[in-house]
Swiss-Prot record:
It comes from Prochlorococcus marinus (strain MIT 9515). It comes from the Bacteria. Binds to 23S rRNA. Forms part of two intersubunit bridges in the 70S ribosome. The gene is rplN. Keywords: Ribonucleoprotein, Ribosomal protein, RNA-binding, rRNA-binding. Belongs to the universal ribosomal protein uL14 family. Part of the 50S ribosomal subunit. Forms a cluster with proteins L3 and L19. In the 70S ribosome, L14 and L19 interact and together make contacts with the 16S rRNA in bridges B5 and B8. This is Large ribosomal subunit protein uL14.
Length: 121
């Protein structure tokens, strides 16, 4: 579960390395899960890339340490909390996605991120 002040690792090559969640988008929502969009601040970034430190960006959650339960009875959990930066059209800012992503992204119409990911769990 991602909430305000949560630190996230960035799972793409947009230039940012770490994010801090500012707000979970939605009507008065407190927690974000896989596939939810958050507003975040860039805390660490690579020089000469698309984003800079202290930029405010939108990101979609692709991995969480909180257990994700599926309708089939399975449950999965990842090793970190990770997000992918997106633009206003909900397309990823980077051209590559690192690490596995959850299958729930396909249900929430983030098919471009799913197609870029090396593994979908």
């Amino acid at each position: 579960m991602i909430q305000q002040e949560t630190y996230l690792t960035v799972a793409d090559n947009s230039g940012a390395k770490r994010l801090q969640c500012i707000r979970v988008l939605g009507s008065n929502r407190r927690y974000a899960h896989v596939g939810d969009v958050v507003v975040a601040s860039v805390k660490d970034a690579l020089p000469n890339m698309g984003v800079k430190k202290s930029d405010v960006v939108k990101a979609v959650i692709v991995r969480t340490r909180h257990t994700l339960r599926r309708n089939t009875g399975n449950s999965i959990r990842f090793d970190d909390n990770a997000a992918v930066l997106i633009n206003e059209d909900k397309n990823p800012k980077g051209t590559r996605v690192f690490g596995p992503v959850a299958r729930e992204l396909r249900d929430k119409n983030f098919t471009k991120i799913v197609s870029l990911a090396p593994e979908v769990i």
